[in-house]
Amino acid sequence: MRLTRRQTLASAAALCAASPAIAQNTAPPPQRPLFGAQHWRLANGLEVAFIPFSRAPVVTQYLFFAAGGAEDPAGRSGVAHFLEHMMFKGSPKIGVGDFSRLVAREGGNDNAFTSRDVTAYHQAVEASRLGMILEMEADRMAAALIPQEFLESERGVVLEERQQRTDSNPRARFREAFTAALWGRQHWAGRPIIGWEDEIRAISRDDLAGFHARFYAPANATLVIGGAVPEDEVRRLVDKHYGGITARAAARRDRAPAPSQAAEPRLIRRDPMTRDALFLKAWMAPSLTAGERAHALPLEVLSHLLGGGQGSRLHKVLVETGLAVSAGTGYDGDAAGMTEFYLSAMPRPGVTPERLEEAANAVIETLIQQGPTEAEVARAIRQLTAGAMLALDGFGAGPRMVGGTLAIGLPLDAVEFWPARISAVTRDQVEAAARAVLPSAPSCTAWLLPAA
């Protein structure tokens, strides 16, 4: 599972929304870097960051590749995710299935994830074993075997994963259809990361090997080390194990522009497997890397004040009045391309879809017409920055957030000084961002309903 900087901080900010005392008493120094990461690049193009962490004698390695589901070839959705699975099927130094076994033997753990923008592999071990995991990861980066004899069995694993997580889950099916309705079924942002079933079945070893050859190069990767190891030792070991990998030109993300309108502006799905209705609405929106980038940080503040838990406008108007069981918003500005600003709500039993949708639209319209209050903006920023400090408590948060930021092409300062940047957002900027996106950006409104 991928947790972006926004998702990591948003989960902590939600805790602050539920507990105002935390937000009041946890304010970050405005110009102090969150992690104090050291940052350099090897001669072959590999970007490296190191985050000291001395609370426990452990170390973690995150290796991000700037290629996710959005980079899947046309007609082959799911290649990036399928390759993630096949990367555990051996390399010149590591036998099939031995990677995780060797990490576990040292008392560590490992995993991987694929998102729309990146594929990442990570391990955590006792600090003295850093060299071991660097050597193993560098080996499969340079020369993963991707053996043909394991292709069909792993395809079965991927298809079973899709069956369990999506096909047998009415809400997951609905959300998948909703994303495709907004962007288009074959647009890079509209395809599921795991892939459409028919396209998963068509993926060949050549597809996987070609993706590896194109994207799994040092100049297309970001390595983040966090832990209780001296910096000079980290530099020595990284250069020893990764420095010899042949340099290749970085692959460019080749993505179509955002469509001028939603593929399906309105989507209604009835499902006999669902009991509770679900309302979704999403707008295409700029990010920190695409579109009107100046709106990205204000949109983060807007998302929190509009639907960031208790005290937000949607919670007050929909949940506290008894119209909805839950209501919230989401926005991920940390994206390598255009992204979405979305709203979700579940009506209480007895509340009609029409009534809930009308109330939600009224909240949006009022915000567009009147803008947020200074108090709302200040409260949202206070909770978001407090959430940033709470996120520092987790051992893996730093490498995950730093790596995810660098891998989409943003500078290190974008995450290190995020509290200061978000604190500088003004009420007028939030109002301008809301008016730039909510009234006119391509959008999709959708309902999942029980069978009639």
Where are these predicted regions, by residue range?
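N-terminal export signals
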Residues: 2, 7-24
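Cleaved targeting-peptide boundary
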Residues: 24-30
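Mature N-terminal segment immediately following signal peptide/propeptide cleavage
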Residues: 32-60
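M16 family metallopeptidases and their MPP-like homologs
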Residues: 51, 56-80, 96-141, 171-198, ...
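Active-site SXXK
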Residues: 77-91
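Sec-exported extracytoplasmic/periplasmic mature domains
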Residues: 87-92, 104, 108, 135-146, ...
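An aromatic/glycine/proline-enriched structural segment found at the starts
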Residues: 185, 189, 193, 218, ...
